[in-house]
Amino acid sequence: QSIALFLPDRAVLIEEWADIPLSEYLSKIEEIAPRILECRETPRYLAHTATLRATFALTHFSDARVFLLDHLCKQENKIGPHFQRPIATGGLRFVLPESNDHIGNLTVIIESFRHGRNEIFVEVKGVFGREPVAADSIGVILENTQSVRAFISERIFPYLEQFDHPKDLFS
């Protein structure tokens, strides 16, 4: 479902539980982003965010919690005794600040997917405020959204893939 949410200080475009190509989502942004500026009588966006989510199925692990917490983070038998309850989901969170070489602050969440035992849920939120974006330069928002998607496929997937091997390879 497509949602446009208008708040006093921001507009949020959401494609929730959507299996659409990124190009289709970018077309929606390209269409509505200039209109929002016009309706609000605002010359530019001072900042924008792009949040993209994906899931990855594991090849050699049937439980994403075991993969992330026990295998990747080496927490086997170290969590339960302290928290004394089962873990529904668990994972990692990284905050990657903007630099001269990389535009935008990225918040990366990698966790077990509660709807699929052997799947990893990934969310990357990019916050871009380096340059204001006017109606005639909406392409900047599209490029930054594409860069968030590229980060998932070119950085996170290979990062996880290096650990998704049979356990005996690491013993």
Question: PLM features: residue spans?
Answer:
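N-terminal low-complexity, intrinsically disordered segments
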Residues: 1-16
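Signature of extracytoplasmic/envelope-associated structural regions
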Residues: 2, 34-42, 75-76, 127-129, ...
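Short beta-strand-to-loop capping motifs
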Residues: 14-18, 54, 126-130
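Extended intrinsically disordered, low-complexity coil regions enriched in Ser, Thr, Gly, Ala
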Residues: 20-28, 38, 140
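Extracellular-facing segments of soluble proteins and assemblies that are Gly/Ser/Thr-biased and enriched
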Residues: 27-61
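Hydrophobic, Leu/Ile/Phe/Ala-enriched alpha-helical segments that form helix-helix packing faces
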Residues: 29-40, 72, 76, 145-164
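Aromatic/basic-lined ligand-recognition segments
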Residues: 47-125
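Long, compositionally biased interface segments
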Residues: 118-171
